[in-house]
Amino acid sequence: MAKDKLISPSFCYILAANFLLFFAFYLILPILPFYLQDQFDADKSMIGFILSCYTIAALCIRPFSGYLLDTFARRPLYLLAYSVFMVIFAGYMIASLLSIFIVLRILHGFAFGMVTVAGNTILIDILPSSRRGEGIGYYGLANNIAMSFGPMIGLFMQGNFTYDVIFSCSLLSGSLGFIMAYMVKTPYKQPVKREPISLDRFFLVKGTWAGISLLLLSIPYGMTTTYVAMYAAEIGISVNSGLYFTFMAMGLAVSRLFSGRQVDKGRITLVISLGMYLAAATFFLLAALKELMHWNPVFSSYLYIGIALSQGVAFGTMFPAFNTLFVNLAPNNQRGTATSTYLTSWDVGIGIGLMAGGSIAQELGGFNYAYLSGACLTVLSTFFFLFKAGPHFNRHKLR
């Protein structure tokens, strides 16, 4: 039997829009701690608080995003959120006070929270159900390519250009992404009956256990994407920190090429479990790097890159599986809510990781302690998924 068609113009446009959105995001992500330190003289704890405002704002808007997307036309909401996300990069260039920067960061988080839920939901509308896992994998691959180039280019530009130039490049990327988003055509959506507002219109209750497991897993991920460059500088690793993101993105990209197909074959819980085992190992090794640097700096530098690649494989394996897991627990008229719950769970953990990572490093004297605590949380998440979230999914999945 011939496979359902995966590639379409709208699928290509939304991939491009997603890449440009995340390129704009990742371009400034690793330089923001340095920007706050240089421009506003913020300490590690304050940096963690400010950066977490973005994630907390995205978290707050996620449940409402899911409800709005399940109730109203999705494309206009997607374009509105994308335009706001794009414009705020210009605001960073004129923010002369820390308080103004914080307000802009919160607004940016709201826009990011809405546009990512909308993009994921529209993607699911476009994809044939028989190739959903594969399509989600390629969609995530666009994120990974952005992650491969964005942080590396951002860190390079930090040493050669002003911060305003970097923000301008993010603004340009966002503008091009908005054009791509405008080209996306969505299938006709049947009007739905306006049901009374209840908890399950904002949060997929059946996804609670999987959400807890994903939340625990995302805490150390948030610590890594934000603080790994500072950690490398702290312990004296000579490798360009931008390479960490490049190799991590390579791992994410390679793993997505096969994990989505395994998900479409029904091996969702197996794929997630294997990814969790590898993720736990990478965080323990990341925590051990500080001590290993005293033993053999050259070996530790190579290990640093190896950890990045392995971490990418671990999370790239899990992302399409977790996304599909939430969608498969929900009826078709709650796709937005399912996507919102998936991303909300992720954002809660990222926000905790941003705040906790800086605070742990400040109080205990190094980011290695933050990554050690993150490794322990990954082990806890693995046990929780194996004995609670996974069995619950197998009992309650709708497809």
Regions found by a protein language model. Give the residues of each.
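Helix-breaking motifs and short loop linkers at transmembrane-helix boundaries and internal kinks
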Residues: D41, A73, I94-S99, R267, ...
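C-terminal membrane-cytosol helix-exit motif in multi-pass small-molecule transporters
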Residues: L171-Q190, F384-K388
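Conserved MFS/SLC helix-loop-helix module at the cytosolic interface between two early adjacent transmembrane helices
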Residues: C60-S96
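Cytoplasmic helix-loop-helix junction between adjacent transmembrane helices
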Residues: I106-A142
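Structural signature of the two symmetry-related core transmembrane helices
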Residues: P76-A90, L171, L270-L285
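Helix-loop boundary and gating motifs at the non-cytosolic
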Residues: P9-G48, S218-Y231, I235-I237
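Paired small-residue
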Residues: S99-L107, Y302-S310
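Residue-level signature of mid-helix packing/kink "hotspots" within the transmembrane helices
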Residues: T55-P63, M147-S148, A249-A253, L257, ...
